[in-house]
Amino acid sequence: MNEKNNAVNQAGRHTSAPSPAAGFEVLLITGMSGAGRSHAANSIEDMGWYVVDNMPPKLLVPLVDMMTSSGSNIHKLAAVIDVRSRDYFDDLSAVLSHLDDLGVKTRILFLDASNEVLIKRYESVRRPHPLQQGNRLIDGILEERDLLKNLKEHADIVIDTSALSIHQLSTKLYEGLLGSGPTTVSVHIFSFGFKYGIPIDADFVADVRFLPNPFWVPELRSLTGKDKPVSDYVLSSEGAEEFLDAYEKAIAIAIEGYAQEDKHYVTIAFGCTGGQHRSVAMSEALAKRLRARGLTVSVSARELDKRSAD
């Protein structure tokens, strides 16, 4: 058993031969109770990891085997591990060795906070510490800290959350896992028809009914904003490009702010009367502009999608 195995009892790694699981990543999220494991798990899930909460260590290997042998498109698994039970230390040591044999890259994230901060957090939610067992709150915290001491020393990433907000913790996680803070926001743009209801899940709603309606042009009526004749008609209309110029600038400013505030998904809706022509064309046009800025953008057409499903 190498040094890391001895420390988790101790979390070890060693080079192994290639296997179907080679290249798969496992992140173990652990640390002091009240230090922010749940918040960390949510942020890590936003980074594209498949997150499992309260995972017994001995179930990790079967789960990785299932994911890598079933052709799953999941390649990164984050598991919130509760290792307060001393038996779990032995389980975790054996599991890490087995994952190493499979060629899985494993890392341990340990979240910590000062005793004073942990006490304030527990008092604010009026819940007992899991190891308190009728004793003082500080006794439970000290017992857990002693139990996790070796694990913390051999963790790959240690974050003290004592003075961090949720947003700051998320930024720290990005830096620790990806090497940089969150700088991009994923954008989803969709079109809709006002006569079918205003969407309630959009961050921005643009009303483009001020543009001429292709519906009243006989040769365009049966087409949609995805068709070039309709798109050309809409975008060449007076005010269309000017509107897109202004809207693009406003959205770009907002996206920069969202990234700083740890908001990584933005939904923009374009509405016209029926959701077939103008809103579709304008959605596609804005998507093209934002992609040129290097943003990840997806586009959908609510009313057209409904029609296709019927």
Swiss-Prot record:
Record GO terms (molecular function): ATP binding; GTP binding
Pfam families membership: PapZ_C, RapZ-like_N
Chain residues that bind ATP: 31-38
Signal peptide: none
Taxonomy, superkingdom: Bacteria
Keywords from the named record: ATP-binding, GTP-binding, Nucleotide-binding
Annotated positions binding GTP: 82-85
Statement: the UniProt record of this protein carries the keyword Ribonucleoprotein: no
Similarity field: Belongs to the RapZ-like family.
HAMAP family in the record: RapZ_like
Function noted in UniProt: Displays ATPase and GTPase activities.
Protein's name in the database: Nucleotide-binding protein BAD_0837
Biological source species: Bifidobacterium adolescentis (strain ATCC 15703 / DSM 20083 / NCTC 11814 / E194a)
Lineage: Bacteria, Bacillati, Actinomycetota, Actinomycetes, Bifidobacteriales
